[in-house]
Each structure stands twice: as C-alpha cells, then as structure tokens.
C-alpha cells in the first residue's frame, strides 16, 4: 500500500475486526511487559533492608504499584516488610507476574484469531447487510463495564470485603502495612492523603459509570447531536479516548509528584516538597523536644528517633535532586545507605549551638554556613581563607553526635568539623557504601520522579493528539475541500479506507 509510518493505522479504518485485533495485541504487550518487568525486578531486588535500602532506593518501578494494591509476599520466602513467609500462594509477586504473562499469551492468540477472522456478522446491519457499528451503544457498553470494575475495586478490594485492602501508612511513612480501608463519605474523603477517599470515590464513580452506561444503552442521541459531534465516525472515538487517557495521566502525575494516599512514601520515596518544607526535620525536632520534656538526655532523645524517619530527612532521597537523564537507581548515585551516624550538634567556643543551613533542592553546590538560633551567621567554610572572618578555625567550632553510630562522639579537629558541616547541609548524616555498586556520587531521581516525568510528558503529547484527531473529525469536510453549501445528502468519508471496494464512487 506504500503508507508512510505515520499513517499506517489507516489499515484498520472501516475494519472493526482488525481494529479489535490490534487493541487486543496492545493489551497483550502491556500485560506481557508488566509480568516480565516484575520478574526482572524480583531478580535484582534485595529485600534484606526495607529501612535503609527500600524498593524506591533500588529503582523498582512495578513492585511499588503491586505492593500498594495488597501484594507483599514472594515465593523466595520474604515479604516487603522484612518478615519470613512460609506459603505465599498465588497472591504474590511471582504469582501475579505469571498471571500477567499467561494472560498476555492468551491475548496474543486472541489477537491473531481476530486478525484472521476479521469479517464477522456482528459488524453488519442485519436489515441492510452493510457494515454498521453502533458507536453510541459501544460507548454505553464500555462505560457500564468500566463502572462495574470501578465499583468492584472500591467496594470489595479496597474495603477488604473480598480482597486484601491497600497499603496504608501514617503521615511520616513509618508504620505502613496492607489493610482494609473504610470508605470516607464526609468532607475528609476529599483530602488526597485520606485512604478512605480511595474507596468512597471508586464506589461513587463506579455507580455513576453504571448509571451512565445504562443511560447510553437505552437512550439514543438526538440526530443533531449525533451529526454535530460526528458520533458515527471512528476517529471521534479515537479523539475522546485520547482525551480520557491524557486527563488520567495529568491527574496521576500530580498525585505522584505532590504526594497522596495513593503514592505512599514507603513505596515511592519522599516528595521534594517534604525536603523544601522541612517536613521530616520538624517531626524529628518535635520528638526530640518531647523526649527532653520527659527528662531524657540529648543522647537518649536522639537515640529514640527511628532510623527510617532520619533517612527520609536526607536530601539524597529528594526526587528533584537527581537529573532526569541520569540513568539508574538512587543506590547507583550516592550509594547504599549502611547506617545513621547520628545527629551532629555544632557549637562555637562560647558553647552557643550553631545550625548548618541546609542545601535548597535546586542547588548542586551551596556555601557551608552556620547560623545561631536567631539566624545570624556565626561561622562558615570560606571560599578565600585570606579574607575569612567566620572560619571554623577562627570561631572554634566543635561537633558532637547524638544517636546513631557516633552517639556521644565529639570532634574538635577543624578538618573533621568542616567535613561533617558539609555533610550536614544534606540533612541527617548516613554512612553510604559506594563500592558495592560502583556508585559515582551523583544523585539520582526516585521512581516518583521518573513516573511524574513520563506521565506529564505523555499527557502533553496525548493532549496534542486529542486536539489533532478531534479537529480532523469535526472539520473533515472543511479539510477535504467539500463545498459547505452542498445540498446532496451524503456523509463524506463514510468509506475512507484506501482500496476499499465498497467505497461509493458516484455522487449521490
């Protein structure tokens, strides 16, 4: 036929059998990719340290999505929280991966069948014997079925009525586990961080979809609306389908980047705004002050801080620190976290506590500045020693650690103090193993960043596709140069497939 690459999809115009075939093949490819990618990730995933080397640090992409839906066990005998598993069964990572691969194979065979047997009676009007697709009715069927699936997910899977529930955690990502969720029917259900909204919104949207589907199955569109919106043209279906996809992509890009109950910190890593706003730092400070109020020593108060919480308060886990074109997992950048060294407290020679100013997200380098509780600069690591007034040596800065591996260890050597001041710019200080993976020391983004970038980019592309195909179907006669004052009762382009012998060649 000699079609250019960007027009090859015209081969399925006015060929509903093969249109179905290519969609089934697409489903086969998607399901096959999901299953295969899961098996690959399971082959490289190390579940031994869910606190300092969680899935998102290792660059896992599909495992977090499976986990948030209630899968936590592996046939290898481990689960995502670090416990030992005896009999994981089918509802496991390998079980679901295998199911997707088997489903992909069945879809592949179905696609071949529909490609070979494309000319089915169901596509023809029994009254006229001509090719006829009732697209509004097809829309109603799809809407009804998607409504049933949506309602079923919210009413059964999420609530635990028939299913495991979903991943639910506290606001600081410390106690996450899979559990049933009760629907939130009040105003709190609109809070994106309330898991109950997931159940209630799926139930409500499912009911709406079922009712809308029944409406479109039982009520015919007015002729003026049918003609005006080109409801008989398959390209109208393409345009509106692309609109649904790009809208969904924009939504999930937002919920992933800004955070929500659907994108837990434990599965996808912190958001950049949690670093920008000092979210975890403030919680750590609150816990330390609460410990001191209970007459605990500084060492005891800091030792009670969970290592998991301290690790979140480290800039290397900020998804905006890694460049989008730096390939690889976070562990390939700054290394595998081995342990928390503790919280450094800096003091000048008068004993006044100093605080290291933290690096903002979009800086690669940042001056090392130490300020007092009023925010006044008291010490720094100068760029030019000859002009320095606040150098560590001149001010007599010392550092002492509380909690972690260096608990109650102090340093007065200026070189060591400056080393830890530089590292304190990046949040809590951790020992990082760069040798195992030959990590290069350059920050990487987390799956949260990759997902957002991919979905926002494709949403923009699909938005353009929606405009393109919508304009083509609405203004097809204009683009083709048909006289707008033509009185003949014809629908131009009813048969527009190249080489179609049924195309009418005479003017009606």
From Swiss-Prot:
One of its GO terms (molecular function) is chlorophyll binding. It is a multi-pass membrane protein. GO terms for cellular component: chloroplast thylakoid membrane; photosystem II. The chain crosses the membrane at residues 21-36, 101-115, 140-156, 203-218, 237-252, 457-472. Binds multiple chlorophylls. PSII binds additional chlorophylls, carotenoids and specific lipids. Belongs to the PsbB/PsbC family. PsbB subfamily. This is Photosystem II CP47 reaction center protein. It comes from Pinus koraiensis.
